[in-house]
UniProtKB/Swiss-Prot annotation:
Keywords: Cytoplasm, Methylation, Protein biosynthesis. The modification N5-methylglutamine is found at Q234. Gene3D superfamilies: 3.30.160.20, 3.30.70.1660, 6.10.140.1950. SUPFAM superfamilies: Release factor. It comes from Clostridium botulinum (strain Alaska E43 / Type E3). Peptide chain release factor 1 directs the termination of translation in response to the peptide chain termination codons UAG and UAA. It is found in: Cytoplasm. Belongs to the prokaryotic/mitochondrial release factor family. This is Peptide chain release factor 1. One of its GO terms (molecular function) is translation release factor activity, codon specific.
Length: 360
């Protein structure tokens, strides 16, 4: 029963409240901060549970009053109150079930977004730029900050590849569903016959990880330095400031030339490498899960075609949940929250189904 689990969580919350008020624990700041975070994670569940208990109590009181009431107007008022409380009871049950779902430990983290042009040549590179702009505009709407880690541009303004960081609370929880193949259908500017071309762009969203989560030994990396280049390979720096890091055990390679400082480029490249190694380990773990238990929504398979952007129809279709929106211009301007909310809801529904019995 979920009620038993909720009672246990409430007791745990109360125990933590006592502990964080203990002067002896407060002296150990690391332990105190850990307990405060643990309590904060439980607070929203406890508050919902307390409201749920109050609603149940109020319902019972109003029903008892109704059975003893003879005045017609009072009966109408009580019936309205009972109806309102019953609706809130159902809402809270759904909210609590979602709150009790296992939390992705990466949800609160910053992210690295990697966008690469796929099939389609110049058109794919141009659409890679469109997606980069879409995500940065969305980040602005969320009051998040962005920072380019590495960039490989084309002569016509497209991106062969761009890796950038988005810093903000809950960034991974909202953007993790964007990993996969994005397909675009449109008429290129150079197409005189008006024929629609199909191109693809690959997006990968990686949570930022720290040194403790992924340790990289010095002996496992080879660091090469070279001069940064701009459009068409032209040199834009007279010093060897660009950095290429090769992780020897895995073969992963990360380059960064965005900064003028070699040290800063190395720091950025190491951050990206650490996140790629983390994702690789997570993917290997996920591959070990039986196929029938894998998520339908998906948050990590780069080869999965997840979405189509059709310019002639002004349409965006997400193939995982079958949702189609007809607002392509505003979507590409960063108004993607409706799609993200739908993906989160679908993911939550699937997880609740896997949990089985969710009766209160």
């Amino acid at each position: 029963m979920l009620l038993d689990k909720l009672a246990f969580i409430e007791n745990k919350y109360d125990e933590l409240s006592v502990k964080i008020s203990d002067p002896s624990i407060m002296q150990n700041q690391n332990e105190w901060r850990k307990l405060c975070k643990e309590q904060a994670d439980l607070e929203i569940i406890v508050n919902a549970y307390k409201e749920y208990k109050q609603v149940i109590e109020d319902l019972q009181v109003n029903k008892e009053m109704l059975s003893d009431e003879s005045d017609r107007e009072m009966k109408e008022m009580l019936n309205e109150e009972i109806s309102s409380l019953a609706e809130r009871e159902i809402e809270l049950e759904k909210e609590i079930q979602i709150l009790l779902l296992p939390k992705d430990p990466n949800d609160d983290k910053n992210v690295f977004v990697e966008i690469r042009g796929g099939a389609g040549g110049d058109e794919a590179a141009l659409f890679a730029y469109n997606l980069f702009r879409m995500y940065t505009r969305y980040a602005e709407r969320q009051r998040w900050s962005t920072e380019i880690m590495s960039l490989n541009e084309t002569d016509i303004g497209g991106f062969k590849e761009v890796v950038f960081m988005i810093k903000g609370n809950g960034a991974y929880s909202k953007l993790k569903y964007e990993s996969g193949v994005h397909r675009v259908q449109r008429v290129p500017d150079t197409e005189s016959s008006g024929r629609i071309h199909t191109s693809t762009v690959t997006v990968a969203v990686l949570p930022e990880v720290d040194d403790v989560e992924i340790e990289i030994a010095d002996k496992d990396v080879r660091i090469d330095v070279f001069r940064a280049s701009g459009h068409g390979g032209q040199c834009v720096n007279t010093t060897d400031s660009a950095v290429r890091i090769t992780h020897l055990p895995s073969g992963l390679v990360v380059s960064c030339q965005d900064e003028k400082s070699q040290l800063k480029n190395k720091e950025k490249a190491m951050k990206v490498l650490r996140s790629r190694l983390f994702e690789k380990a997570e993917q290997e773990r996920a591959d070990g899960i039986a196929a029938d238990r894998k998520s339908q929504v998906g948050t990590g398979d780069r080869s999965e075609r997840i979405r189509t952007y059709n310019y002639p129809q002004g349409r965006i279709t997400d193939h995982r949940i079958g949702l189609t929106l007809y607002k392509l211009d505003s979507f590409l301007d960063g108004e993607v929250q409706e799609m993200i909310n739908a993906l989160i809801t679908a993911d939550q529904a699937e997880k609740m189904q896997k949990m089985g019995n969710t009766e209160m």
